[in-house]
Every structure is written in structure tokens, then in C-alpha cells.
A protein has these predicted regions:
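Short aromatic/hydrophobic "clamp" motif used to bind/position activated sugar donors
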Residues: 92
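Short beta-strand/loop segment that forms part of the nucleotide-sugar
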Residues: 26, 35-48, 68-70
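Hydrophobic helical membrane-anchoring modules
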Residues: 1-6, 17-18, 177-238
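Catalytic metal- and UDP-sugar-binding loop of GT-A-like glycosyltransferases, i.e.
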Residues: 70, 95-97
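A conserved acidic beta->alpha catalytic loop
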Residues: 45-53, 99
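Conserved donor nucleotide-binding strand/loop of the catalytic core
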Residues: 54-86
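Acceptor/aglycone-binding surface of glycosyltransferases and processive sugar-polymer synthases
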Residues: 72, 78-86, 103-182, 209-219, ...
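Short, well-formed alpha-helical segments that are part of the catalytic scaffolds
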Residues: 15-32
């Protein structure tokens, strides 16, 4: 694997039924769009304990999908670091297993990495995103983005969009993250923005119309407040 290879990293934890079929279908679409490129698909099982995972797992065994597993559950950040560390592609993209963003959006990330030679491409949600989002999630997202915009000097306040890509320079930065759960995205953008030599692009992307949102865990949100504070402290004391 090398210059023409993209590693697609997909973390999974207690997925809904049909998750494996979605991965196979969407990865097939990407391969059709870029027939001259090799795609390394890596699924990282973050300690799933559901039968849905086991049922889908068997469907991946006969396909060109690499599966990494561990227990117990450690968080999305740790799952992605595990997958990124194991990846062998020159470029890396990560998203969620339900592929919540359009294939065209993923293609924009790929083109920015391949054609524009960007080190890191950060997907940000287009304005119509909030038309699809449940009220509680919408409110929490807007409050979070307000604090990011007001308190941190980084290139975007939409750090939690679940579609990002990077080359080997960006990979090295990503592997420096330490947050195990959701604010690893913010930490990644924060670390990248501190190095002015890194070529970062902010790319607007679109949500698929039929995306189903999971219920938000308020306990995790409380815990992530501490991680936000740690990043904020680092931004001021170095």
C-alpha cells in the first residue's frame, strides 16, 4: 500500500442491524468513484456486546475488510487511534459506520487530499444540517460551538463533524491525541492548528437525508466538559 491507497477507518460500538451491509455498499460506491485507487477498510470494534455486531461481523469476513477488536469499550477516540495506527494507506479518512454524510462529501475530502495535497481536511456541516437534528442535540451543538468559537483560537468551531481526512503529516498529529471519547475531534483540530506549517482545509459537507440520530448520553456530555477544560488550559499555558 502507498501513494494510491486510502485507509477508511470506521469505529463501531453496539451498532444497529444492517451495519455491515451499509459498510460494504458505501465502500463499493467509493471504489467505483476511484477505480485507480486502493481502499483499505478498517473496522474497529470498540468493545461491542450486542448480537447485531456479531451478526454483521460474519458478513465482513468474506470481504476485503480488516476487523480489529478489543474489550472493554474505551471510546470513539481510542477506537480511531487504534485504527489509524494500524492503517497502511498514504491517506486516511474516518467517519461513522452508518456513513451519515453523502458520498459526494467524502469525495470532496479525497480530492482535497489527493489533488490539492492538503495535510488535513476538516469536514464541517452545511447550514441545512440543523434542519435534520433533534432539538436537544441541536441546542447542545450550538452551545458547544459558541464556547469553542469564544475561547479557542482554532480554524473552525465545528470540530465534531464526523468526517475528516489526512495524509501522513496529519496522521502523526492525530496519533498525538489522548482523549478517548468524543472530544478527541476538538483535540485533533487544536493540535493541528498549533503548527502553522500544516496545510489545513475546511470543507463543507452534507448530511444524508435518511440519517437516524442516536439518543444523546448526558452523562458522557458531563464527562467531556472536563476534557474541554483540559484543552482550554493547554491553549493558554502551552
Amino acid at each position: 500500500m502507498g501513494n494510491n491507497t486510502i485507509s477508511l477507518i470506521l469505529p463501531v460500538y453496539n451498532p444497529a442491524s444492517g451495519w455491515a451491509e451499509i459498510i460494504l455498499a458505501k465502500s463499493k460506491e467509493l471504489r467505483a468513484l476511484y477505480p485507480d485507487m486502493d481502499f483499505e477498510v478498517i473496522v474497529v470494534n470498540d468493545g461491542s456486546v450486542s448480537s447485531n455486531f456479531d451478526n454483521g461481523k460474519s458478513k465482513l469476513k468474506s470481504e476485503s475488510v480488516r476487523l480489529i477488536e478489543y474489550t472493554p469499550n474505551k471510546g470513539k477516540g481510542e477506537a480511531l487511534r487504534t485504527g489509524v495506527l494500524a492503517s497502511s494507506g498514504e491517506m486516511v479518512i474516518y467517519t461513522d459506520i452508518d456513513f451519515p454524510y453523502t458520498i459526494d462529501s467524502m469525495s470532496r475530502i479525497i480530492r482535497s487530499l489527493c489533488d490539492e495535497k492538503r495535510n488535513i481536511v476538516i469536514g464541517i456541516k452545511d447550514p441545512s444540517y440543523y434542519d435534520h437534528v433533534p432539538p436537544l442535540r441541536r441546542s447542545i451543538s450550538r452551545v458547544f460551538r459558541f464556547f469553542v468559537r469564544s475561547l479557542l483560537r482554532i480554524p473552525t468551531d465545528d470540530t465534531q463533524c464526523g468526517l475528516k481526512g489526512f495524509d501522513q503529516v496529519g496522521k502523526a498529529v492525530f496519533l498525538k491525541t489522548t482523549i478517548d471519547r468524543y472530544l478527541f475531534d476538538l483535540e485533533f483540530v487544536f493540535l493541528a492548528s498549533r503548527d502553522r506549517s500544516i496545510n489545513i482545509k475546511i470543507q463543507e459537507i452534507e448530511l444524508r437525508d435518511d440519517v437516524q440520530f442516536r439518543k444523546m448520553n448526558l452523562g458522557i456530555i458531563r464527562n467531556e466538559a472536563w476534557n474541554f477544560l483540559k484543552i482550554l488550559i493547554r491553549s493558554y499555558v502551552g
